């Protein structure tokens, strides 16, 4: 319901109604703007991943992690970055594409006699899909682009910790590292643009 209301709100903006560059992914935009969805945000940019691993959103703004955040117990001392080499991503897609429903169904023809396929707002395939990574692409707002956004549609829990194709890069939290990343990302402004 909240995602539908979010989409209705976005459709009040003129540039949404005149957008003809590509499909608008309302679920993905909702996820990037703080609504809970079935999507897991991921990025192709290591510095963006580091920002989210070393900073926290606290009292309405981003700040670097400090010792009081990371030195509570063994669980909080370490951060984790999940990385999938790019050659594994397309291999995973090629091994799963036949599991999608209606992926080859023609829904009709356009005025030029070309095939028209159903436009999906999210994947129809809800069974085991091995954490497929979807490119978000260009969207009418800049946040997805500035975060080099991709997404995994998590219709059911498939923890990245259990996924053997994701490399797990564990690191020891360090207040100095957190501050440096925070400053390099201009306090988050480098990936959270001012959009009006």
Each model region followed by its residue ranges:
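Catalytic-core elements of nucleic-acid end-processing and repair enzymes
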Residues: 1-196
């Amino acid at each position: 319901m909240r995602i539908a209301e979010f989409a209705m709100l976005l459709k009040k903006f003129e540039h949404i109604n005149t957008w003809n560059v590509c499909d608008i992914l309302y679920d993905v935009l909702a996820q990037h703007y703080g609504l809970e969805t079935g999507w897991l945000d991921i990025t192709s940019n290591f510095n963006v991943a580091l920002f989210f691993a070393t900073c926290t959103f606290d009292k309405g703004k981003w700040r670097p992690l400090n010792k009081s955040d990371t030195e509570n117990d063994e669980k909080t001392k370490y951060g984790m970055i999940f990385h999938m080499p790019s050659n594994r991503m397309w291999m995973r897609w090629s091994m799963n594409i036949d599991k999608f429903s209606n992926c080859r169904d023609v829904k009709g023809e356009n005025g030029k006699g070309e095939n028209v396929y159903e436009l999906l707002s999210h994947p129809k395939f809800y069974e085991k899909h091995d954490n497929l990574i979807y490119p978000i692409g260009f969207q009418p707002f800049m946040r997805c682009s500035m975060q080099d956004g991709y997404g995994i549609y998590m219709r059911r829990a498939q923890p990245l910790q259990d996924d053997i194709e994701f490399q797990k890069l564990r690191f020891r939290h360090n207040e100095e590292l957190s501050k440096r990343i925070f400053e390099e990302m201009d306090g988050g402004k480098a990936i959270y643009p001012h959009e009006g």
